[in-house]
Amino acid sequence: MKLLVILLFSGLITGFRSDSSSSLPPKLLLVSFDGFRADYLNNYEFPHLQNFIKEGVLVEHVKNVFITKTFPNHYSIVTGLYEESHGIVANSMYDAVTKKHFSDSNDKDPFWWNEAVPIWVTNQLQENRSSAAAMWPGTDVPIHNTISSYFMNYNSSVSFEERLNNITMWLNNSNPPVTFATLYWEEPDASGHKYGPEDKENMSRVLKKIDDLIGDLVQKLKMLGLWENLNVIITSDHGMTQCSQDRLINLDVCIDHSYYTLIDLSPVAAILPKINRTEVYNRLKNCSSHMNVYLKEDIPNRFYYQHNDRIQPIILVADEGWTIVLNESSQKCDHGYDNSLPSMHPFLAAHGPAFHKGYKHSTINIVDIYPMMCHILGLKPHPNNGTFGHTKCLLVDQWCINLPEAIAIVIGSLLVLTMLTCLIIIMQNRLSVPRPFSRLQLQEDDDDPLIG
């Protein structure tokens, strides 16, 4: 009976494992389409992306980090760290000690990036490996005195086709081989700000173009013979929500601009007081019922957004769809809001020898992507905030079981064991059934005559 149980569970475990061994070194391409909101997948048609998912895995929601902006979340993907830990805490920053400023047009100083070690640096430092990058934030900066062997300086006017051609050329023909590569594209974020997720007509056109680019990516990889052995992750940094001229929070109505310096604006405004901090806070805290005002030490723990000098003394967080302004104008749509909001979440899809086929998973954290990528590449991860266990179900070489599967396996196992037990009992009963009645056998003393 014990042997049967051991064999049963050995079979179950074996069924969840797959041989992913290969003589080729593992390779990984990480692709980001900026501002790709998770539910775009449900609301629009993506034939090329759906084919990609059908042969790979899909994570329906990736919970990103606060604040839900481009630079911070792209750095969280490749470091596995919260913003307070990796130091890229916003798209616009100020360091009070060095008096330095950071922005999307002034981002090349390694000072801002050196609080963490991104995966392309770790990979680049390995023997017989190199990294490549097509405009992923930070990849054109020497971080810890290391830069990828192959990279493109950021230029938004460079086409997706040119970026793709460079990346595939480097993946296909480099020495030492490129084993980790990144590719970044500004859409659908740029159009999302302009039109918004509720503009079906325009966003349908924009997202069709995105899907066509994914089709071009897959076709290019197949044409160059990279498709079968290359692991590809397609994801994003954040989503998008609709804003309105009717939902504005005008700071000039609440406080004189001479009292503070505005480091970053909506929907999370970073305030550096010029006068007493408490006075500035008191003037702002009742400014709008649609905005939370926090002293730095009171920022909710769930944001992991306190412990860094680049986080300003006062933070303003607008409600979803509301915009913090200094005048009456605003863009139609934005991101950066509370990272618990589904509208802020991106998705993740992946394909390749490291991943299952046709598997869907509900949610992971954006910081979980880093330890998963390190595992795929065989790299030792730096200390991080991610949890590798959250992504095990995506990978063919990992034992993984979620709650519904666990319940199904337990019930199935009990049914099988019950059937086996019943079968054994039936067989034992058959062997111990009494033989049919036979003629009475006389003992030796029964042969004596009854009458002497």
UniProtKB/Swiss-Prot annotation:
Topology of this chain in the membrane: Single-pass type I membrane protein
EC nos: 3.6.1.29
InterPro entries: Alkaline_phosphatase_core_sf, Phosphodiest/P_Trfase
Compartments where found: Cell membrane
Any one GO MF annotation of this record: metal ion binding
Residues reported in the UniProt entry to bind substrate: N91, Y154, D189
Primary enzyme class: hydrolase
Transmembrane annotation, as ranges: 407-427
Cofactor(s), by name: Zn(2+)
Sugar attachment sites: N155, N166, N276
UniProt topological domain (Cytoplasmic) ranges: 428-452
Protein family membership: Belongs to the nucleotide pyrophosphatase/phosphodiesterase family.
Role description: Hydrolyzes extracellular Ap3A into AMP and ADP, and Ap4A into AMP and ATP. Ap3A and Ap4A are diadenosine polyphosphates thought to induce proliferation of vascular smooth muscle cells. Acts as a procoagulant, mediating platelet aggregation at the site of nascent thrombus via release of ADP from Ap3A and activation of ADP receptors.
Name of protein: Bis(5'-adenosyl)-triphosphatase ENPP4
Protein's organism: Pongo abelii (Sumatran orangutan)
